[in-house]
């Protein structure tokens, strides 16, 4: 594994995150609240007056920097997961444990620390649902943290969770794969350990699949090999397993990622539920588009962004896989410059984190190969 592939993974995920239309909404959280309220009012005006001019996030008399192209929540939660890998790579901390146990201990400590912040916020609020948290997170993550704060432990924190099926852990799994390059099973096991804090069912299966695929992409495997490893983690009898196999069949009949978009839109993407973040949709879409794009990020990410229902995370998942496959050299310089720095819109403590520097740190934690 080379630093360039880790860098490609992180920058690819960030570029995909930035490419999806929800990114601007997430980044708008750094604007004054009244700007978001005004956007909602303009949307209501358009609905009531039957106008087809739809509002977008606005700055008006405020500095517009938060609304410019850049990564948002997915990239920040991937960096959150990467921090555990960094802690486990420090042999001076918990040095009496194996690296695998250190990594799991680091993950647990990370979640426990955030849950403590949730508990403190809950104590200041009349009820936990109204607590003002020092972060922004998916429903599954917020519920999982609430469960931890209430004294539950995994797998209950992920099982007793209204959004156990979403893909929050799939995003984190992409970064966790760095811990086990070339070893899809151990990468998947680590991703499941983390996923159980917030997910169950397809949410866990999807995390295992993404970790397995990324573990092989980081050592230069072909896209078909990576996708095959992902499929082994998706049971046939599950919705995510059925969707993934069908999506890949569709990819095999398509001439390009662009040609695949309508097929995925009509046969894989759900149009009933309120949120487009089900792992059973976004992971199959990412795997299929990476395959149809032949591992090329410049084709996979724009195609994923075209699927508006799943644009909150499918482009990031596709970008992580194809970014690792092609390495950092496949990320255009313009995208690299726009996406390398986190804004802190979801995790304020990660504001100004440089993903290129994070890739260097992750590479430095890798154990020495036998023979030097």
Residue map of PLM features:
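Structured, active/binding-site neighborhoods that engage oxygen-rich ligands
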Residues: 1-372
